[in-house]
């Protein structure tokens, strides 16, 4: 139904009706159009053949598609990539296909997906490559020339992430800090540990995260390489010779760098007067491991027969037996050159490692018995970095590359988050965290003494903090051996249980605080025998939401 014609009072002529949509010519000249096609103005002007509806501008809030074209009149400069605006869904899809980190899952895929087929530069160390990223080493001209950019393009600082350029400064700072720890008696890490790191061009927004993934990558790819500075510096400290330098037989023995991993382990064990039965957790020396399972009555009976034995009556092998080869900082014992285990008063103290290599990890912590002691004596934060590096050293000495890849995958899910959560904390916050840990440990020790259940308490790095006497009766380990030498929980587990440990911990570190259950957890005794158990973990967090301690209960499976 058409509207009635309205007569204008000023002109006395019918008013021109507003058109629903102007034609293209009237739209350009901003003139009033009508609904006829061709309109009256186009007929008068001779544009009747081209009079069509004009195109309206779509409102921005109604536009579903972003304008991906650059502005009119602007052209990008040569060599500058113009990135179009993308929706969140498109951006996520493109980042996933290109291999760039977008979420935690993509970061995992980026670093773990290419591990089985790494790129090997001239220096012999495979690097964890990332699609679309240039790999650059800061280790000198020789390594920088290992990979050349394609197409004749030169690598300029503008093509690298901003935080990647300060990696070398970060490494120097951390080395200096670790050197200060050694001067204060807390530890002495060799700078060679960091000299062989393969720093890949990761583009995370955190320097600490980039550093962490470089350490994890190097942990996997330097495993089993005799010339790896990382493994040599952590296993042998700052010394380039065998620890048993006073033995005349060392002149005829091959150096550890020239031997295979298995031969190197046996050589160092024999040079320290240890017997074959002391190797209780090594897949590389599987002939030393007893595959039989002990029952709880046998272990209890064995412990009862040795309850009243004094330390002076123990044999030399029992005194020297380390918990494991790779992390036994070792009680300083004297042996003569023939390695028979007898004491030599004139020779200096020796251990499997150099005296200061992992001292920060295995220094005996004070035993607090009262809350006042906790709040009064704890004035410095607890350093988790030496413990983490000690754990990596142990894993590299025990497991093969395929197992290390699986463990690194799980570590990559929680380790960078630990660093990110603690970066914003002040020193007073870290001191308070340690006070909370020790205060909570006091209460748990009371509860463990009353519960009667085999129980262990360890930190998020895996270092044992408390052990119940029931666990000692179950496993055969003494409390002095487990707590006095700052043992890792993974040392008490067999290979499959260690892999399951890292998988469960990555799931509960920032997930369900109620803990997890390991239906089949196999413990290792001092003699290398295995005990099947079922364990339950309870995770306790600090006031900042970080995992503080894990309480594990172990019950034997007798069937």
From Swiss-Prot:
Residues 139-159, 231-244 have a biased composition (Low complexity). Residues 245-260 have a biased composition (Polar residues). Its main location: nucleus. Keywords: Activator, DNA-binding, Gluconeogenesis, Metal-binding, Nucleus, Transcription, Transcription regulation, Zinc. GO terms for cellular component: nucleus. It is found in: Nucleus. Gene3D superfamilies: Zn(2)-C6 fungal-type DNA-binding domain. One of its GO terms (molecular function) is DNA-binding transcription factor activity, RNA polymerase II-specific. SUPFAM superfamilies: Zn2/Cys6 DNA-binding domain (SSF57701). InterPro entries: ERT1_acuK_gluconeogen_tf, PAS, PAS_13, Zn2-C6_fun-type_DNA-bd_sf, Zn2Cys6_DnaBD. Residues 440-512 form the PAS domain. Residues 63-159, 231-263, 329-349 are annotated as: Disordered. Residues 23-51 bind DNA. GO terms for biological process: cellular response to starvation; gluconeogenesis. Transcription factor which regulates nonfermentable carbon utilization. Activator of gluconeogenetic genes. Belongs to the ERT1/acuK family. This is Transcription activator of gluconeogenesis ERT1-2. It comes from Yarrowia lipolytica (strain CLIB 122 / E 150) (Yeast). The lineage of its organism: Eukaryota, Fungi, Dikarya, Ascomycota, Saccharomycotina. The gene is ERT1-2.
